A protein has these predicted regions:
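Conserved N-terminal glycine-rich FAD pyrophosphate-binding loop of Rossmann-like flavoproteins
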Residues: 45-71, 108-117
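Residue-level detector of alpha-helix initiation sites
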Residues: 21-22, 26, 184, 325
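FAD cofactor-binding and catalytic pocket of flavoenzymes
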Residues: 88-107, 111-114, 142-146, 347-410
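Gly/Ala-rich phosphate-binding loop of Rossmann-like dinucleotide-binding domains
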Residues: 28, 32
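Beta1/beta-strand and adjacent pyrophosphate-binding region of the FAD-binding site
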Residues: 7-23
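Conserved redox-cofactor binding core of oxidoreductases
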Residues: 65, 71-88, 94-100, 104, ...
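A conserved short coil-to-beta-strand element within the FAD-binding core of flavoproteins
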Residues: 209-210, 282-298
């Protein structure tokens, strides 16, 4: 695998990508399969899920009884490395001293980014989500529609492997026939919710998750994704054959050494590296995007975290895929006489009005479960069922002051 050091950088690349998570991984995969020469900059270290995931370890294997460490904030039985709300050696400031008004986000410094600990719930945005102003009078409509994006949803779902069912529910789009893998059986609690949800008009249906419930069809999918490109088809087929189906036995948060659960390293970067068109420079913290005299992106300046030295890599194009906050940081850092407020920031709005998801959780004791025979229903290490977005218009109609709805996972 061509993991390189700064002194091994080529003079020029077709594309420089910052970030190796879902966006950066997919971009690297798509470009390299088409023959484009790509450099990927990753702020964290190299990570191999097949050899570093403690999915089969018993509690007795954990050092210090599994207590958290600077490297693993959630303890030994967690696949994350160098991740957390704060990262050692990366100080940052808050704009507000009141804790309730501070914005914090989870950062991941490892190859594959946050795909390593993402819950892998893989639902599509629906038609309403692309046109919030037309529907609710808030925000702005996207210049594209769900129909424009739908074919690409199909392609990504076939590539990464998503299980689920098509239910024909409002604003919860179905996949094309043959795209989804079979949904696993619902667990007892999910069946209980489904039974009683019907009484109050709430749909409880199989969720869509990026976990292989069955082996992928390596004979036909590569040709669908890469028509007319036999080399790309061969590389993808080999990658798909290296992934095993989930055997419903361990916690996905420990990582997935058998590649059943999606992560960028296993699904995107492995075949991208096999093309010979991808170099990966890890432990390289991007600092700013550099421009040519015409004002076009010409490369990225980075800090080598091994030595603290500054480096630069040239590229004909630059892709920022470092997550919303880190990509914003790079845009704002990239100031020049032509762009005094940073790149793509003539409005002065870059970095403002970021919105996080609002979520909560609850638990309950259900007497009906008492006395149930012991049985194994570990499943896919996360929900098998969910309540699709509901009450999409009722909130506003009932005078609650906001549009939107609610979504539940079990």
């Amino acid at each position: 695998m061509p993991f390189i050091t700064p002194d091994q950088l080529q003079k020029d690349y077709d594309v420089v990508i910052v970030g190796s998570g879902a966006g950066g991984g997919q971009m690297a995969y798509t470009l390299t399969m088409a023959g484009v020469k790509v450099l990927l900059l990753e702020a964290g270290r190299k990570f191999d899920p097949t050899s570093e995931s403690p999915m089969f370890h018993l509690p007795s294997h954990a050092p210090l009884r599994g207590i958290s460490t600077p490297d693993k904030q959630y303890g030994f039985h967690d696949c994350s490395i160098q991740s957390g709300w704060t990262i050692p050696g990366e100080p940052y400031t808050q704009a507000n001293v009141e804790p309730s008004r501070q914005f914090r986000w989870w950062r991941q410094r490892m190859l594959g980014g946050r795909t390593n600990h993402w819950g892998r719930t893989a639902l599509r945005n629906g038609p309403y989500d692309f046109k919030p102003y037309s529907r609710h009078g808030v925000g702005f409509d996207w210049p594209i529609s769900y129909e424009d994006v739908a074919p690409y949803y199909d392609k990504v779902e076939m590539l990464v492997g998503v299980f689920g069912t098509n239910e024909g529910i409002e604003n919860s789009p179905d996949s094309s026939p043959g795209v989804l893998l079979p949904a696993p059986k619902l667990r007892v609690g999910e069946l209980y919710a489904q039974k009683h949800g019907k009484k109050v008009g709430v749909s409880v249906v199989p969720i869509h998750r990026a976990v292989l419930s069955a082996r992928q069809d390596a004979e036909t999918i590569p040709a669908k994704l890469h028509p007319g490109n036999p080399r790309a088809q061969r590389i993808l087929a080999e990658s798909m054959r290296s992934r095993a189906a989930c055997f419903w036995a361990t916690d996905c948060h420990r990582g997935c050494a058998i590649k059943a659960a999606y992560d960028s390293t296993s699904v995107h970067l492995t075949p991208a590296l096999a093309t010979g068109n991808l170099d990966i420079l890890s432990l390289a913290m991007a600092r700013e995007v550099t421009l040519n005299p015409q004002g076009k992106a010409s490369g990225v300046t980075f800090i080598d975290k091994r030595t603290g030295q500054e480096g630069h890599v040239a590229g004909k194009a630059v892709v920022l895929a470092a997550g919303s906050q880190e990509s914003v940081r790079l845009l704002l850092n990239s100031k020049s006489s032509r762009f005094p407020q940073g790149l793509a920031n003539s409005s002065g709005k870059v970095g403002k009005y970021l919105t996080d998801s609002v979520s909560s959780s609850y638990g309950a004791h259900i007497p009906a479960y008492e006395g149930m025979p012991l049985h194994n229903e570990d499943g896919a290490g996360g929900p098998h069922a969910y309540v699709p977005w509901t009450l999409l218009a009722e909130n506003k109609e009932m005078g609650l002051g906001f549009p939107g709805g609610y979504h539940l996972e079990f």
